[in-house]
């Protein structure tokens, strides 16, 4: 529930990407800037209701970004994974050069106030 209204979203995945250098992080940010809208357009057709790419700024001396995906059902989450895997494969050469450490979590939204 958001505020007093039910939303379409009930599942979320959150991924944190940690980079060794600022240059690696900036390259990865550029990849998302170039390709993120296209990926979301594909995911939206499969039930992804929200995509957000963020830079984590409160950890001094570290280089981190994160992604947030929200889905309208468990099936939408499953359906989106193929598109996400295809996206990952399309940038694999860049990923190997950047080599981020990825930490993933999958969440059920219990309360979301705004």
Predicted regions and their residues:
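Short, Lys/Arg-enriched N-terminal segments with co-localized hydrophobic residues
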Residues: 1-5
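Short coil/turn motifs at beta-sheet boundaries
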Residues: 8-10, 60-62
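Active-site-flanking beta-strand signature of metal-NTP-handling nucleotidyl enzymes
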Residues: 10-18, 66
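Beta-strand elements of well-folded, non-transmembrane domains
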Residues: 17-21, 73
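Short, surface-exposed ligand-recognition loops at beta-strand->loop->(often short) alpha-helix junctions
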Residues: 20-31
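An amphipathic, aromatic/His-enriched active-site/gating alpha helix that lines ligand/cofactor pockets
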Residues: 34-50, 60-61, 68-108, 114
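Short, solvent-exposed loop/turn elements at beta->coil junctions and helix N-caps
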Residues: 53-57
């Amino acid at each position: 529930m958001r505020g007093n209204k039910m939303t379409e979203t009930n599942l979320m995945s959150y991924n944190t990407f940690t980079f060794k250098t600022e240059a690696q992080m900036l390259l990865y940010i550029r990849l998302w800037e170039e390709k993120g809208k296209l990926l979301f357009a594909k995911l939206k057709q499969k039930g992804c209701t929200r995509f957000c790419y963020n830079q984590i700024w409160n950890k001094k001396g570290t280089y981190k970004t994160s992604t947030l995906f929200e889905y309208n059902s468990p099936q939408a989450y499953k359906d989106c994974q193929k598109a996400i895997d295809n996206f990952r494969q399309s940038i694999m050469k860049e990923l190997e050069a950047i080599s981020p450490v990825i930490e993933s979590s999958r969440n059920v939204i219990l309360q979301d106030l705004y």
